[in-house]
A protein has these predicted regions:
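Conserved aromatic
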Residues: 14-15, 126, 160
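Acidic, metal-coordinating helix/loop segments flanking the phosphotransfer/catalytic sites
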Residues: 2-33, 43
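Amphipathic alpha-helical packing elements
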Residues: 143-174
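Output/docking surface of receiver
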Residues: 9-16, 44-47, 68-113
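Nuclease catalytic cores that cleave nucleic-acid phosphodiester bonds
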Residues: 54, 73-83, 165-172
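A short, hydrophobic beta-strand element within the central beta-sheet of small alpha/beta folds
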Residues: 33-36, 53-75, 88
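Short amphipathic alpha-helix used as the core "switch/output" element in two-component signaling
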Residues: 15, 22, 39-64
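CheY-like receiver
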Residues: 98-101, 105-138
């Protein structure tokens, strides 16, 4: 039971840019994803671009980690796109649903969907490790390489507390 509790993903909260960077530096090898607002304190003053600067810094260190920018200012969607982040409009009536879906899909909590890298068409879907074991050899090589090299599989395994195989697969990046 203790191991299961330790293996559960944790959410950490930063109130400033500096706190966010300290947390990222401390946990960067175990981060499933980053959710940030656009506007918060940086250098002791509220910076409307603090979250965008955080996205830029994290993306420069990890090209595959899922990023989410949430903002009441829809113009910030451009910055989310620039850094490969999802955007959540804080004014949306379904903000909580949008955020939940993105976290489930991008942070590895939902089903794992293997896609054709050229068409993004679904080629296989697994709900759990047993299903992965049953279909792994039927998944097209190109799809498997695509997902492994972008840390999709390792992130999915991390979210299920399967640390040894996740660590092993995270090191594999084919270009």
């Amino acid at each position: 039971r203790t191991l299961r509790m330790r293996g559960r993903p944790k959410i950490v909260l930063a109130r400033t840019y500096e706190e966010a960077m300290d947390l990222y530096n401390k946990y960067q090898n175990n981060v499933l994803g980053v959710i940030t607002d656009a506007r918060y304190p940086r250098g002791g003053v509220v910076d409307p671009m603090a979250g965008i600067k955080l996205l830029a810094e994290v993306r420069s260190r990890d090209p595959f980690v899922p990023l989410i920018l949430q903002s009441a200012e829809v113009d910030n969607k451009v910055y989310a796109s620039r850094y490969g982040a999802s955007f959540v409009d804080k004014n949306s009536k379904k903000m909580n649903i949008d955020l939940r879906e993105i976290v489930s899909d991008d942070f590895g909590f939902g089903d794992f969907i293997f896609r054709n890298p050229d068409t993004l068409e679904e080629v296989a879907r697994v709900h759990n490790l047993k299903e992965l074991q049953n279909v792994i050899f039927a998944i097209p090589k190109e799809s498997l390489l695509y997902h492994i090299s972008r840390n999709h599989v390792s992130r999915w395994l991390y979210s299920r507390a399967m640390f040894p195989p996740a660590e092993f697969l995270k090191q594999i990046t084919w270009e």
